[in-house]
């Protein structure tokens, strides 16, 4: 959530940030500013009525003790209480209205994020490892998976519907091995391994920015205030929801393997075959909570941690700086890692490492204490890595002419 003080003090900065996202809201912002100003006036008036109520109540008590006439004071108290209740209700309603409107405004675009109109304006930062030159036409992962009996796509449809898969046999062993390898690498880089629930309440999804704006993308449990998590970013970040952390305990670095669930609303017709886009998938996530001065360095550290895994698996990849219009709702700056898929003859996203600055921390009330003062922390998140897409990349990059798959040395000890 953006700072309402900033909206009032530097309206143009907020408006410009939204325009950079192709999400202009000038009229809505102006109306919101008017509501905030009106709210502040009413709040001052409410505080005045409360002070008056306290003052008269004391006078009433003194006169009662003196057995003096209190009828006038009693009437004053009753009339003031009516005004107090009415104004208190109005202030509460305005507060809710402001919070709701603020909650659907995306994060401010970081100064380091380049201006762009769409994903075509994203900027390649660097490439790591050179794609292999094949002496045969490389197959796509779904062909290789079916040939080797590793993935049963029809079984997933039978059990659920499209965009679900069943992984079995040696494919399941590779899948499990990838998870173990990712967690080991992340732990080596200082991230604590944590297992969390796959269900969370509405407050947690508000904290990380999925609600209320993206309700249609999340699976909800009927008749319960519970949702299936779209990413472990939600659970790991919100472990510190409404928490004040001692500055000596920063940074907090966490990693988790979880199933993730997404409705993929708006993805009709995209990646309909294979494991690229699923309703349920596994992901190993990185989350960090840092001092504001340290979040940029942490973002680089998280990127290198994810890249280290891809290098160990001998998978060519590249870093891509997202432009302003391609940023996620909560992100201020995002760098994607894209892995080379020879079967598709292109790079595809396998990790997205985002610095949200204090945006999530303000929503989730994640603070740290320094010099006896509470301040908002910075939060970061990123995949390290998406397990299914890593398996896709492994199959396509390490396929042999006969359709068999070479196993990288780093993975052998996990099998």
From Swiss-Prot:
Gene3D superfamilies hit by this protein: Bira Bifunctional Protein, Domain 2, Serine-tRNA synthetase, tRNA binding domain
Claim: ATP-binding is one of the keywords in the record: yes
Reactions that this protein is recorded to catalyse: tRNA(Ser) + L-serine + ATP = L-seryl-tRNA(Ser) + AMP + diphosphate + H(+); tRNA(Sec) + L-serine + ATP = L-seryl-tRNA(Sec) + AMP + diphosphate + H(+)
Keywords: Aminoacyl-tRNA synthetase, ATP-binding, Cytoplasm, Ligase, Nucleotide-binding, Protein biosynthesis
Pathway entry: Aminoacyl-tRNA biosynthesis; selenocysteinyl-tRNA(Sec) biosynthesis; L-seryl-tRNA(Sec) from L-serine and tRNA(Sec): step 1/1
Subcellular location: Cytoplasm
Primary enzyme class: ligase
Residues at which L-serine binds: 231-233, 285, 383
EC number: 6.1.1.11
One GO BP annotation of this record: seryl-tRNA aminoacylation
Main location as per UniProt: cytoplasm
UniProt xrefs under PROSITE patterns: AA_TRNA_LIGASE_II
GO cellular component: a single term: cytoplasm
UniProt xrefs under SUPFAM superfamilies: Class II aaRS and biotin synthetases (SSF55681), tRNA-binding arm (SSF46589)
Residues that bind ATP: 262-264, 349-352
UniProt-listed HAMAP family: Ser_tRNA_synth_type1
Assembly with partners or alone: Homodimer. The tRNA molecule binds across the dimer.
Protein name, per record: Serine--tRNA ligase
Organism: Helicobacter pylori (strain G27)
Upper classification of the organism: Bacteria, Pseudomonadati, Campylobacterota, Epsilonproteobacteria, Campylobacterales
């Amino acid at each position: 959530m953006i700072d309402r003080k900033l909206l009032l003090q530097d309206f143009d900065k907020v408006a410009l940030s939204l325009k950079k996202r192709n999400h202009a809201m000038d009229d809505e912002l102006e109306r919101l500013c008017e509501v905030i100003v009106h709210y502040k006036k009413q709040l001052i008036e409410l505080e005045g009525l409360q002070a008056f109520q306290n003052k008269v109540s004391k006078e009433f008590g003194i006169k009662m003790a003196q057995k003096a006439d209190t009828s006038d004071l009693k009437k004053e108290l009753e009339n003031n209480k009516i005004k107090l209740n009415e104004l208190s209700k109005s202030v509460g309603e305005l507060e809710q209205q402001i919070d709701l409107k603020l909650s659907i405004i995306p994060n401010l675009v970081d100064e380091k994020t380049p201006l762009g109109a769409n994903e075509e304006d994203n900027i390649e930062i660097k490439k790591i490892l050179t794609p292999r030159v094949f002496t045969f036409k490389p197959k796509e992962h779904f062909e290789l998976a079916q040939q080797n009996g590793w993935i049963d796509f029809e079984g997933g449809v039978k059990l659920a519907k499209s965009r679900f898969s069943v992984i079995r046999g040696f494919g399941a062993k590779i899948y499990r091995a990838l998870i173990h390898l990712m967690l080991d690498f992340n732990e080596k880089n200082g991230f604590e391994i944590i297992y969390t629930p796959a269900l969370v309440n509405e407050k947690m999804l508000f904290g990380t920015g999925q609600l209320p704006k993206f309700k249609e993308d999340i699976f909800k449990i009927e008749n319960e205030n519970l949702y299936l998590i779209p990413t472990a970013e939600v659970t790991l970040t919100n472990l510190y929801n409404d928490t004040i952390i001692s500055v000596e305990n920063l940074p907090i670095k966490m990693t988790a393997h979880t199933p993730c669930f997404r409705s993929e609303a708006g993805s009709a017709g995209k990646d309909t075959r294979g494991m690229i886009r699923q309703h349920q998938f596994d992901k190993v996530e990185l989350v960090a909570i840092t001092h504001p001065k340290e979040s940029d360095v942490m973002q680089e550290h998280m990127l290198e941690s994810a890249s280290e895994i891809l290098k160990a698996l001998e998978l060519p990849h590249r870093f891509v700086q997202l432009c302003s219009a391609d940023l996620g709702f909560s992100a201020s700056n995002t760098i994607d890692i894209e892995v080379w898929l020879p079967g598709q003859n292109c790079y595809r996203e396998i990790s997205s490492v985002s610095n949200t600055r204090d945006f999530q921390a303000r929503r989730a009330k994640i603070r740290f204490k320094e010099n006896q003062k509470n301040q908002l922390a910075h939060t970061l998140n990123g995949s390290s890595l998406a397990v299914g897409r890593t398996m896709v990349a492994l199959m396509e990059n390490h396929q042999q002419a006969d359709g068999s798959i070479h196993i990288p040395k780093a993975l052998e000890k996990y099998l």
